[in-house]
Amino acid sequence: MKTTMAAAATCLVALLVVVLAEAAGVGCTTVAYNDRSLVIDGERRIIISGSIHYPRSTPEMWPDLIKKAKEGGLDAIETYVFWNGHEPHRRQYNFEGNYDIIRFFKEIQNAGLYAILRIGPYICGEWNYGGLPAWLRDIPQMQFRMHNAPFENEMENFTTLIINKMKDANMFAGQGGPIILAQIENEYGNVMGQLNNNQSASEYIHWCADMANKQNVGVPWIMCQQDSDVPHNVVNTCNGFYCHDWFPNRTGIPKIWTENWTGWFKAWDKPDFHRSAEDIAFAVAMFFQKRGSLQNYYMYHGGTNFGRTSGGPYITTSYDYDAPLDEYGNLRQPKYGHLKDLHSVIKSIEKILVHGEYVDANYSDNVTVTKYTLGSTSACFINNRNDNKDLNVTLDGNTHLLPAWSVSILPDCKTVAFNSAKIKAQTTIMVKKANMVEKEPESLKWSWMRENLTPFMTDEKGSYRKNELLEQIVTSTDQSDYLWYRTSLDHKGEASYTLFVNTTGHELYAFVNGMLVGKNHSPNGHFVFQLESAVKLHDGKNYISLLSATIGLKNYGPLFEKMPAGIVGGPVKLIDNNGTGIDLSNSSWSYKAGLAGEYRQIHLDKPGYRWDNNNGTVPINRPFTWYKTTFQAPAGQDTVVVDLLGLNKGVAWVNGNNLGRYWPSYTAAEMGGCHHCDYRGVFQAEGDGQKCLTGCGEPSQRYYHVPRSFLKNGEPNTLILFEEAGGDPSQVIFHSVVAGSVCVSAEVGDAITLSCGQHSKTISTIDVTSFGVARGQCGAYEGGCESKAAYKAFTEACLGKESCTVQIINALTGSGCLSGVLTVQASC
């Protein structure tokens, strides 16, 4: 079988670099591929990977996240590269803090894992503007992601910058580094047909591949979702909830799944999406059954959209994604443990999968059996794609019960080592506990400051003027959510009008002569809306100030350079009672991006700022107000979150670190999927078939992550809020996130392991030891047959310990209980 040695010459091409690397004790790794797998140092490999995005966590979190990924059975970490984070202004670069990409890749290397570098540099990723810097739109003749010299020049400059940084740090496999694959562009095949210029699109995607390959990185280049017009010098890959039936566009290249969506992102008006552990395991097992070679979880850890990084529009600050590691880095059980069990079984048959001969046999009733054979050894997959029918399947004389919508893996074709629908890992219910720091007051003490709107209530002192209504992204270069549009008109006498503003939003506040006369925001997905407000003009000069706000820029789709935001074109009119309008659209408009508090950097709480506490009386429900309080860091090392219930919309900072936008007043819509969850059947995040949703009718996001590295122990910490729309901070409280209840169900003959996780949490009580069918959910189980013998065994083995393991034997059933499945629930 032919092997493409795309990286085999790396050690020769980059001889000097490698010699230096070897002098430091680092070896050279070759990466090639054939139609069965990647070939690393001459060995065919199954690779199980997971996405962790470095800017969505903190450098202090990276080692623990990567360690947990490795312990979960991962071989590699995959990440995008975030262009607008690294180059926020043209030729001004940022590689500090959570943008220290080299430090992140070194942490991957230190853990002994591989890495997949997805440069893009368009990334989508629910990231602001899909990762593209807004300043690109300032460049004349710019067309994004087309065969267009202005865009290609900037893309090549940034791509080369990242590659050179990686080479300088010896991060590519041929230099002894962890990077085994690199990606150029991202999901371009999804938009090629919408660009109205097929020739330019084709020329662009081939230019991307050629430009990437000229970089001589020594590892294969991939392109995801590029199923047609695929350049010959890249490997095309699949993204989706299921990729078992997908195959690459040509022979000789491996089947790679770059994004297996473990859940879904969240918008401000949507509930939480949950993809079951059973369904993900089903999809992964099918993928490897059907010759899959590399599978990546998107996301393995989602993290947080700190600052203004969330895209959308209307993507929440949380990017939890229902991933195996939750937003804060805690294990999401049973998803983490169930997939870990799957990885172990897949790895146990790795050689058979990548070297063995295979036969697919289609049985009746949507059952498929695949048998891999290598010499005298065999491994089998049995796949039941029915979504409502369990089946008995006979294989080589042995009958196996196969639950609906599941795959069984038999490493010897005789004994089932794993079934995707049977979870043996524990379920952990995470709970939030109020800050229990000693001497912390019962409620936070607040001071406040008005946002200074006065400079913006006239049309003077703007950055510039135009006799037209300009587009917001270009005008502000996205340096702030906010852009002021200001004009004035002379009016004879007093009169009443309706102020009419047509905007592409996402949000608008209108002031006339210094008074707030109206506000509105667009519904998600419909970003053209109108504001109509009754106003009174006085005799003489009248001032109209319109504050337009964006809430994350669009991250997906074609023709980004043509996507508008703000009051571009309007119209803006004053309409009298007779319907006669004064069109202000072509008046002289003064423009200024940002708010006074942003320019003053109030969030840094510099000396000299005048905060008012008004003898303890704090104004509430007043727009454009800054609030400040101090608090002690919660004890221990558990996750810290701040509950912002009672507030409306704004931004939060802790010790000057931007936690992101908050909007707890925006409730999640009621959707049918909130009242139905069954792992069986196709999972989808859009359309009519949604299921397994939670949080309908509740705040879209109430809790906001405060990383431990943002906090100071033993001294006051500062929380500053900019409340844009008017809210009440009196309910704000800090919590620690800890394991509450842990539960496991297992059959007689299996072992049950309970764990309260990290940070020295111990098992405090055994609450349920029930044989039979226990009703309810973990944390609130009831029913079944309580076993005193099982209760005694778990009490003796587990109380006061961080974890424990008990073998389930018939003797534990006790009198009156039938042998079968034992459910155990414990409290931490």
UniProtKB/Swiss-Prot annotation:
Signal peptide segment: 1-23
Origin: domain of life: Eukaryota
Catalytic residues in the record: E187 (proton donor), E259 (nucleophile)
EC supergroup of this enzyme: hydrolase
Pfam families given in the database record: BetaGal_gal-bd, GHD, Glyco_hydro_35, SUEL_Lectin
Intracellular or extracellular location(s): Secreted, Extracellular space, Apoplast
Domain SUEL-type lectin: 746-828
Assigned keywords, A-Z: Apoplast, Glycoprotein, Glycosidase, Hydrolase, Secreted, Signal
Annotated glycosylation sites: N157, N198, N249, N260, N362, N366, N392, N502, N578, N586, N615
Gene Ontology cellular-component annotations: apoplast; plant-type cell wall; vacuole
MF-aspect GO terms: beta-galactosidase activity; carbohydrate binding
UniProt catalytic activity: Hydrolysis of terminal non-reducing beta-D-galactose residues in beta-D-galactosides
Enzyme Commission code: 3.2.1.23
GO annotation, biological process: galactose catabolic process; plant-type cell wall modification
Family stated for the protein in its record: Belongs to the glycosyl hydrolase 35 family.
Protein name in the entry: Beta-galactosidase 13
Source organism of the structure: Oryza sativa subsp. japonica
